[in-house]
């Protein structure tokens, strides 16, 4: 039976870039990877309710000591920054204590969280933990993503669905999600919902479009422009009058 690979890792170096961008001597690599892991673990824990979709880490050479540039993508920048930057400054202080290096902390707002796979998966997990129907949660998530400009969406929820004795998987799909096309910008994320019946696994695939030569992922993820409003439908009386007038 064929297994699906992670679409994010499959496209690294082709249309996607790495979330950790730095070079180091071979002996220093394990320590730096562990440092990146601790930074992400801390930020995801502190900003659990802030809708964090991605954390990018770059390492820069400074005059006195090395600097780490952390870019956090979030749907709720107000929660990350806090009043007068209080929450952000506290996070910077904690990270500098953790790494013993200077931290440059940037916050980027995610304009359309409805079509970002990581945020869709997090939102689905939150609803499932609040005892929402797994079918309804998936259908609403797909509709919102398509309305926001996604070309295709696929979801899968696994576990003791509805409290059933036997675990199973159930998913929904709408639009195109070409997993074998390497130029296809497919965003993929997973999440866990901790319910009274056990843990439910959530997988989300979102197709944004194809990255053609000379383009980048940013071109396929431009803000979606709403289409022109649909004409209003006439009521039955107006429609009958219109038909009679045409006949006469």
UniProtKB/Swiss-Prot annotation:
Cellular component terms (Gene Ontology): cytosolic small ribosomal subunit
Gene3D superfamilies: 3.30.300.20, Ribosomal protein S3, C-terminal domain (3.30.1140.32)
Keywords: Ribonucleoprotein, Ribosomal protein, RNA-binding, rRNA-binding
Domain KH type-2: 39-111
Molecular function GO labels: mRNA binding; rRNA binding; structural constituent of ribosome
Keyword Nuclease: no
A GO BP entry: translation
Cross-referenced SMART domains: KH (SM00322)
Annotated region described as Disordered, given as residue ranges: 222-248
InterPro entries reported in the protein's UniProt record: KH_dom, KH_dom-like_a/b, KH_dom_type_2, KH_sf_prok-type, Ribosomal_S3_C_sf, Ribosomal_uS3_bac-typ, Ribosomal_uS3_C, Ribosomal_uS3_CS
Family: Belongs to the universal ribosomal protein uS3 family.
Quaternary structure, from the entry: Part of the 30S ribosomal subunit. Forms a tight complex with proteins S10 and S14.
Function according to Swiss-Prot or TrEMBL: Binds the lower part of the 30S subunit head. Binds mRNA in the 70S ribosome, positioning it for translation.
Protein name: Small ribosomal subunit protein uS3
Organism expressing this protein natively: Alteracholeplasma palmae (strain ATCC 49389 / J233)
